[in-house]
Amino acid sequence: MNDKNIIVNKPEPKPGILERGDLFAIAVGMVIGSGMVTLIGPAMAYTGYSVWLAYLTAIVMGFFMVFPYIILGGTMRVAGGPYSIVTNLSGVSTGGLVAYTKLVTPILNSSFALALGLYLNNLLPGITVKALAIAGVVILFVLNLLGMDIFAKVSKILSTVLLITMVLYVVFGLTQIRQPIFNFSGDKMFTGGFKGFMLAALLLINSANGYYNVLWYGKDAKRATKDVPFAAMSCVPCLLFIYVGLAMVTGGVLPHDEVAGVETILPAAQEILPGIVYKLFMIGGPIMAIITTLNGVFNDVRYPIAQAAKDGWLPKGILKENRFGAPYLIYTYTLIVVLLPIIFDMSFVTITNIFQVITFFMNVTVVYAISRLPKKYPDTWKKNKFHLSSAGLYVFCTISIIIYTIIFIKGIFSIKLVYAVSAVIVMVALILIGVYLTRKGGIRIETSIWQPAEEEKNE
């Protein structure tokens, strides 16, 4: 085997067909998901009626946390995910970190499966939450094994139904608020002080920034460096209305003690909606949000792990596919990772905190790589759509890394010592494996990040 490591950037494709509206719909679908219907109650346990303000803070912090990605999207066409970014801008060894982190990120979907179990339990009270959660994941696993991605062709429709359902619920719910959620001196406001308020915001932040993933559609966008950033940033006002409004409704209809800590938004919904409308809302809103998010885990993990195997980070044997074209070994591994926290009775909060800890190293590595844009592509950087100087980029990247670091520290101190130590040990071990394989050689990486020459031809 050739002992040299090689990075090959694929040729830039011609501009795609996705326009601004298409990209916005994709971005909305990526961010409006199960987090909003599972974390408000637990966050309220930290901060009381000020949970709506904590969600607002989470949205603002989340924006600055992922803004470097959006800046990148306004400078380059990107299609290969974090793996392409770090290998193209920072080198081979960083690619190993991203590739291996993707092996453990499915753990977050355990919380989505638990959420599905909780909501289905309201329709099927005779079956336990754990059984419903496990059954839901296994059914989606089997459907994906059969090559039946049941949401692929209708994702835009489902996202539209979900968006309309949640907007209508928030608009109606805001007229039903009965609790003093705007009384800033009330005894149920800021119940945990500043610490509790920040714990709530940092718990909610992961559900409030997924729109940046539209960046990976740079290959398919017609005007990537213009429309991708626009689509991502246009999600922020939507989140401010839907998420903050939902937190107001969830925390403002019933007394504090009936809602704080509850892992669904159903107590308030059941209080203000008639029976049949309540059930329709539960299916069209929370359950749809959870299923579409949960189903996505298989493809979200499939492509990064498959690429890592092709490039030499993982055994190529895991690429085996069944007769339906599904990589059954990768899917089986993903299923196991998702099921383990459910089997061991971990809570939503614990799962979220573990996820934030294990993704810290990858996130900081990606942001650092983005900060190298002016050095790696000086001419393209001068044309960035935000008209930022290099110093401006460094400032935003520094702010992002600070926020990621705060979340990491919060995560470490918010979970059991054994979980914290295990998470850090796993990530350090994966980093060392990546360094070892880099030194050993034989890694051949294909990246998909381009200076937008083809796009500029059409302007």
Model-assigned labels for residue ranges:
Residues 4-8, 14, 47-52, 69-96, ...:
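Flexible loop linkers connecting adjacent transmembrane helices
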Residues 1-50, 62-63, 67, 79, ...:
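Membrane-interface "cap" regions at the ends of multi-pass membrane proteins
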Residues 317-326, 363-417, 445-457:
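C-terminal membrane-solvent junction of multi-pass transporters and transport-like membrane proteins
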Residues 42, 64-145, 150, 286-307, ...:
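Hydrophobic transmembrane alpha-helices that form the core helical bundles
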Residues 119, 129-179, 191-193, 209, ...:
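Membrane-interface loop-to-helix entry segments
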Residues 9-10, 15, 52, 128, ...:
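Helix-loop-helix junctions that connect adjacent transmembrane segments
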Residues 16-27, 91-104, 135-136, 191-202, ...:
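Select transmembrane alpha-helical segments in multipass membrane proteins
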Residues 82-86, 91, 122, 233-295, ...:
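TM-loop-TM module centered on a large, flexible mid-protein loop between adjacent transmembrane helices
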